[in-house]
Amino acid sequence: SYRIEDNSFNSFIPSYSGTNGAIATHSNLSSITAYNILNDDKGNAFDAAAGAMLVEGLVNPQMFGMGGEGVMILKPKDQSPLVLNGNTISPKKFNFLNLVTRGYTEVPDEGILCAGVPAAFSSIFRMLQLYGKLDFRTISKYAKEYAKEGYPLHTGITVSYTHLTLPTKA
């Protein structure tokens, strides 16, 4: 969802600006979550990013999901930027020697032999383990509340599913 048009007419994707930081998410619910984690819960930017990602995965599953990827570029204070690669991880019992004995010189591009375990969720946990300040219960409470109480459905979801036919009882 890359936007180049003016979004000032669209209340679903508001523009936020300030003098003490910035929050950029696709959903306003994710931005509000990040804001609350920073201000109400006294978390840091990594806590806010994790909370926003959890909400985004819930309210915008067509854009990001826990069963997917979570690559992050992080900039801890007084450290060089680093990349946390949350694409996929190899299954626990994966052994490259098994591929070699089958005649492969590298992991194939398609098929079961190249399957990886989705790592978005584990990359969020790793980021919090390294740089987070708050506990996971505090960070995840906003996503949990939206999941329990409901949230406005994004039009991208409804448009994506209008072509599907639901089964009917005979």
Task: Describe the role of every protein-language-model region.
Residues 165-170:
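A short, hydrophobic C-terminal helix/tail in secreted or cell-surface proteins
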Residues 2-40, 45-164:
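Noncatalytic scaffold domains of N-terminal-nucleophile
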